[in-house]
């Protein structure tokens, strides 16, 4: 991304309203209120914001607050103070911290062209430190960059021992083999790209996807695991409700279309080994080898499959349960043990149930396309 692009984006953003708050009368008064931090594209412009609805079928999902951003956003993170962090889709040049509904302006962090954001950021439990996956533009090597949450200044940087690092999650289990010390699990997507061609994939025969465990205090490598099939990119992560298993959404990068379309979309990690979970034929081919967002509830695993226009569901043991139809399904989140899934014109409450509850998208979302991820706002 050039300095000219950054200056142009800043000039555009200077003329944008930082926050748009919908009046409270726009929302229904029945059922419990649900709010989700999300990102979307609408008529060529890009936004992050807060979406709001109430529990119960037919309650519209409305835009409650929004911030226009210069390019597509990807991952979001909510801090304990209620502020929302969002990063640009890889290779991204911006990260923003924003407090919806306060009237205060957003806090921007721009890359200098020597590195890029990889789409995901994670906060420490107290919200004081941020951990983002980033990539060096010259070498292609990925890192975890630790930043102060208030100033966004870098305080540490650790290698992920791979390329194309994507999502990262905490492992705070006492029985994780590392005492009571929290560790970070990071998915190295392993897909080679070049700074001059952005997201264009190249040299896929050299793919090297893995998950790594890092000491969260020092960044020391504590373990690294790979699948047998090197053309499966490990990307998005979610713990089972009991934290015994980590689910990983996969994206296939095989040269052969048939192999790519029938590839699994889910892998499971028990702390010592990785294994893929396959859907039965002919369902597997319909999934197109592309897993988007990842979530887990007491009912089981959910992997959004936007190319299949549905959500692939599995038991917690990995048995196939079914494909929940939802056009352009992508963002997933869990609230009170129930799965919320976002689609093109409506979203689903309790999407794994026999009869999910549909929430039509309100006027602010009509014609909009939700991005890959959203996060439930508590309270």
Predicted regions and their residues:
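Surface loop/turn motifs at the tips and blade-to-blade linkers of beta-strand repeat domains
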Residues: 66-70, 110-113, 158-161, 225-230, ...
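Asp-box/WD-like beta-propeller blade repeats and closely related beta-sheet repeat scaffolds
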Residues: 114-120, 133-171
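Short, conserved, GDST-rich strand-edge loop motifs in beta-rich repeat architectures
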Residues: 133-136, 186-207, 249-262
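N-terminal secretory signal peptides and thylakoid transit peptides that target proteins
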Residues: 1-16
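Beta-propeller blade signature
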Residues: 144-148, 204-216, 263-271
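Repeated scaffold domains used in trafficking and secretory/extracellular systems
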Residues: 71-77, 116-122, 163-169, 232-237, ...
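Residue-level detector of Asp-centered blade-edge/turn motifs that repeat once per structural unit
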Residues: 79-81, 125-126, 172-174, 179-180, ...
């Amino acid at each position: 991304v050039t300095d000219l692009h950054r200056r142009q984006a800043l000039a555009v953003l200077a003329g944008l309203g930082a926050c748009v708050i919908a009046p409270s009368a726009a929302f229904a008064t029945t059922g419990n209120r649900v709010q989700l931090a999300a990102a979307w594209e609408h008529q060529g412009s890009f936004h992050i914001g807060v979406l709001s609805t109430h529990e119960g079928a037919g309650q519209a999902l409305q835009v409650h607050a929004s911030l226009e951003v210069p390019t597509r956003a990807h991952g979001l993170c909510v801090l304990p103070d209620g502020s929302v962090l969002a990063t640009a889709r890889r290779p991204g040049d911006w990260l923003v911290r924003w407090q919806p509904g306060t009237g205060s302006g957003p806090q921007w962090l721009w890359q200098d062209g020597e590195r890029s954001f990889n789409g995901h950021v994670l906060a420490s439990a107290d919200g004081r430190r941020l951990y983002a996956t980033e990539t060096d533009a010259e070498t292609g090597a990925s890192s975890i960059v630790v930043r102060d949450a208030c100033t966004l200044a870098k305080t540490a940087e650790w290698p992920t021992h791979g390329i194309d690092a994507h999502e990262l999650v905490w492992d705070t289990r006492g029985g994780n083999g590392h005492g009571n010390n929290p560790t970070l699990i990071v998915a190295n997507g392993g897909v080679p790209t070049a700074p001059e061609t952005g997201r264009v994939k190249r040299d896929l025969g050299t793919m090297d996807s893995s998950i790594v465990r890092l000491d969260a205090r020092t960044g020391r490598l504590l373990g690294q695991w790979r699948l047998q099939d090197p053309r499966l990119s490990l990307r998005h992560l979610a713990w089972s409700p009991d934290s015994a298993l980590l689910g990983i959404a996969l994206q296939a990068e095989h040269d052969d279309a048939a192999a790519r379309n029938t590839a699994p979309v889910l892998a499971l990690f028990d702390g010592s080994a990785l294994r893929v979970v396959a859907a039965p034929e002919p369902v597997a081919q319909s999934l197109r080898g592309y897993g988007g967002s990842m979530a887990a509830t007491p009912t089981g695993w959910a992997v959004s499959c936007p190319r299949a226009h549905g959500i692939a569901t599995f038991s917690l043991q990995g048995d196939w349960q079914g494909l929940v139809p939802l056009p352009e399904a992508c963002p997933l989140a869990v609230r009170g043990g129930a799965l919320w899934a976002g689609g093109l014109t409506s979203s689903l409450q309790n999407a794994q149930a026999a009869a999910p509850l549909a929430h039509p998208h309100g006027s602010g979302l009509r014609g909009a396309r939700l991005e890959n991820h959203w996060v439930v706002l508590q309270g």
